[in-house]
Amino acid sequence: MTSKRPTFTDKEALDFHSQPTPGKLSVTPTKPMATQRDLSLAYSPGVAVPVKAIAEDKDLAYEYTSKGNMVAVISNGTAILGLGDLGAMASKPVMEGKSVLFKRFADVDSVDVEVFSKDTEELITTIRNIGETWGGINLEDIASPECFIIESRLREELDIPVFHDDQHGTAIIAAAGLINACNITGRELKDVKVAISGAGAAGLSCAGLIRHLGVKAENILMCDSTGVVYEGRTERMDQFKSAFAVKTEKRTLTEAMDGADVFLGLSIAGAVSKEMVASMAPNPIIFAMANPDPEI
């Protein structure tokens, strides 16, 4: 096996983000703004007309403003990529990056919002109070288990779509890949044994979706930095991990991968060795998805 390295240096990555204009986002008007009349319509006094209309019916914001095609990408920087809690400001390049992906591939306008708080209730309150500004919210890089609580509450309290990308985006892609890989290797989902490295938002969501698709609960061994999530374990457990605890004598990722058909990596670089891969079932399915560097 060879390790795939990026085709750029650190300096090139920094130059990309700083030149010729710092960052990756800008705002472009959708109206010509070429004459005094345009300016009077865009701002005062013309803007008062849609203001009054929206005051009568707030749903008209979808007709008279950019709300319907505008998503907020929101983070507090407590779980940036696989790098950990580096703070809200450090998350900004990632959030800008997600925003430009929305624009490039779906023509959805987006803005990054960094919230400088680690308090769950404060974060919920802040996002709830500004959330209706946009047509949807993409939560990103918020630590587990707080991210589950935040998403659940915001879905209940806001009248717009709320999507936690680290959970659902990762799970959807991983599940789709697993279905295809099983078809290619002649496996049935109900029969595969799965080892998952990483019990954060992405790992738990992947486990939940593949279980929903037909992988047996007892065939999913989830591991975190403490080891296998097994029934009776008390160290570093919470209600979300407990939902995936199984009866097993295995206690380490090495043991979990022994004989496994599938490995889903959502942890850190270097977590898996060649020997661990060799111990898996023949023709193993390996998704090493640690970010920014894979497990192997």
Please give the residue ranges for each predicted region:
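A short, aliphatic-rich alpha-helical micro-motif
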Residues: 131, 189, 256-257, 277-280
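N-terminal ligand-binding/catalytic initiation module
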Residues: 1-162
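A generic local secondary-structure boundary/capping motif
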Residues: 59-64, 127, 184-185, 209-212, ...
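A short helix->loop->beta-strand "cap" motif at the edges of active sites that frequently abuts
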Residues: 159-160, 217-218, 281-285
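Structured core elements
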Residues: 72, 112-114, 136-138, 195-196, ...
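Glycine-rich phosphate/diphosphate-binding loop of Rossmann-like nucleotide-binding domains
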Residues: 81, 86-106, 164, 172-264
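ADP-ribose/adenylate-binding Rossmann-like module
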Residues: 138-141, 165, 264-296
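Short, acidic/small-residue loops that bind anionic groups at enzyme active sites
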Residues: 157-171, 288-291
